[in-house]
Amino acid sequence: MGRVRTKTVKKSSRQVIERYYSKMTLDFHTNKKILEEVAIIPSKRLRNKIAGFSTHLMKRIQKGPVRGISLKLQEEERERRMDFVPDESAIKTDLIEVDKETLDMLSALGMSDLPGVVKQAAEPQAVAALPSYGRGGGGFGRKY
């Protein structure tokens, strides 16, 4: 059964990770020794709790960004994603292919002369239903 971690343990381990991220590892014993060197912690029990939570957070950081911890590497990655500009726009409107029904609706609204709107070349075919087996539990045509 898990234990409740106090605010002191959580805050101190977050601060230690932010400041000494390059030294911290995924190993509890190594993190405990690092905490001994870099922080003044009054008791052995509290030091072990902080080292344990720091190890837990380091494992979570490996998987992705963790709320409450601001690392330079993560901030740079986030900025890179925000500044990304695609080569080709996703909302390119040079040519829009619509079916006959949509074209009729546009003409009813008086918007049939929009630039770039063209009728689709071929009508989409209706998909034939596959035979179902058993009691029809959504098996997508599986026999077994």
Curated annotation (Swiss-Prot):
PROSITE patterns, per the entry: RIBOSOMAL_S17E
InterPro entries in UniProt: Ribosomal_eS17, Ribosomal_eS17_CS, Ribosomal_eS17_sf
Pfam families for this protein: Ribosomal_S17e
GO biological process, one term: translation
Keyword Ribonucleoprotein: yes
GO cellular component, one term: ribosome
Keywords per UniProt: Ribonucleoprotein, Ribosomal protein
One term of GO molecular function: structural constituent of ribosome
Recorded family membership: Belongs to the eukaryotic ribosomal protein eS17 family.
Protein name in UniProt: Small ribosomal subunit protein eS17
Native source organism of the sequence: Solanum lycopersicum
Source species taxonomy: Eukaryota, Viridiplantae, Streptophyta, Embryophyta, Tracheophyta
Gene transcribed to yield this protein: RPS17
